[in-house]
């Protein structure tokens, strides 16, 4: 019934596209008029549009004419004219939606339409790509159009100076990678002046490969970190012990990706730990003093049994480097958190880098939701449309192709074993190679791609291998995958964003010759050669894409298929599967193997059966649903931190912008003075209950006040009068500092102290939230909702953080001393710039350089003294306590607050 209705009325997508086609006629009707304009008149249209906007017109009022102007400019400058379907894509992007356009349909050119239109407001447009190569390529090629129309273009890549970045972000249109944008946002919110920041306020972003950025990478936060204590020796010892465990000592579940020790394993490992003198002979692994070892053992177990070299990570130049499971690319600088990366380093016997504490972090989910207007484009988004709508409020519209798709997608071939599957793939590759048909073979890991490469080498079939180990050559290799007799092996979607043209990509071949002085004479020769090869390739059947396994996500499979058949080109795709494949082995029904044998599957024979195809699709849907729930759950928890992050960042910006910090200083002084007095002189209490001795100690600790006991000798004195006296004494101390150092210097010092204190308590708060998050799921066993509990406790921690901020800020202001001999006007700024220079960012836990500050306003940037989980603190060993909040109960279990016990002299 539903299919009949769809045929009668069309899908919602069909109706949207039909409506947009009616909009295109209005743009097309302007084309003859725009074509008659001279270059100068065409350029002046930008000035005219800006003037209209200044006088109250909206972007929609000038949309049709602006699109027509961009189309004509692209034709004159680049020799490319936007097709009608590309205009539709531009309209979808301008309306803040995601456009799904097949590979080769010219998404890069589509982005010029909404980018130009929205840049006319002067608020900036960000065009976001997945790597530096694409950002540089697109800004250079499309920048010609923008420059022709009088708009400025910037490009952000890794390694640029702040000055260069600031100029690029101030351009009308900025091309940048998602990683650099996120890190620049975090870095900006760690700077000490508005002038040092590089980003402008958020306006409009167009995300290329939007599914990769908003879905595949959504679970990995951007993190700026600093080191905690060095435990490399312990990681090495634990690794040595875990290597001695045998089958039966632990159980693992590949489906749920979990691993744990059995009772037998616990007994065995306790014996090994005792032999290495890591635990006492008479103690157990789960005794209180040994609980921290459980974490190290679990991570070592995961490293040895759940993570494989050349599949999940590479070892290069003495470093463990993570491989992106979706793209097969090395994720430069990214490190696994919670000690897993250190466990992998111990496993691979490379230098173990320190664990790190989070200083700042954000997920792409929350970063991109900062933009008032967001849009994106990709070749595969429909399968993820519900998630994109639910999380980002982005609708997906599939745009029809300019030319009809002639690619043939063949049925999957299923074999009993991996060897039989590879034999069939090899047979097909040989056949295609002999006929000259180019082949692109997609694998799911570096290990599999190198395995297949060795098979082809034995058969003496020349080929190119494209994986994370050779990512520098990625774009060039993939661009030439359509040449006559080309055989290319690629991990998943390596090279995404680069078109595979039948016969080869002439532009990239010409680029390779650019260093040769005689290259111009060879251009015509190259173009003629490519044209000849294209004819041969089309006769051979176009690009044949072979999938060696099904991915967990249907979308990744569709992306691989989409490499063939661009712009109406012929082509074929086919997946080869075996019962040994991970998806079949872990997720598909166990009945499949029996069914295949029943159907008479013989060695070397393939089988096609609808039930198997359905089972595979259900397995993929199950995994996709599971991953979606993980991302959605991550967002629910991250939203709690995001709300707090917004408050802190807004407060930090206000502090930086403020010309006077005295209001906050005075109000906080009064608040703390009242709080301290009432703590030791409770309202309504008798004089004999007043603790004047400890009141004096606390006032000196916080305000550096020498309290006069005679103030309380009067019989009729009240706590209000004492509070007023304390506030006045604090005010006098501050005034004396002002007289000694100057008002301007004190103002700068107070602002700097406030910012550094805010950064310190926020850093500690992030650490507390990390620990809270790690164990919060266990609340479910107590019939409590983990999310509700996390929200409640995170709020309490946030309030405690604000209390700590006030106390530390006031304490520092009233106690600090400046050595005027060494103070320069720019000292504060210079110290912070040095700090920023030594700071590193990554997708997870980068190293953080030690830094010793100069002699003015001493800044202690030693490795972070981190907060320790209370259950891991030894009451008799203060060195095991880590950082303790002054308002916490003292870990020695005296029952007193830390600030009145062991922290009294801290």
From Swiss-Prot:
Species: Rickettsia canadensis (strain McKiel)
Keyword Zinc: yes
GO cellular component: cell envelope Sec protein transport complex; cytosol; plasma membrane
Cofactor binding description: May bind 1 zinc ion per subunit.
The protein, known as: Protein translocase subunit SecA
Swiss-Prot/TrEMBL cofactor(s): Zn(2+)
Positions bound to Zn(2+): 890, 892, 901-902
Catalytic activity: ATP + H2O + cellular proteinSide 1 = ADP + phosphate + cellular proteinSide 2
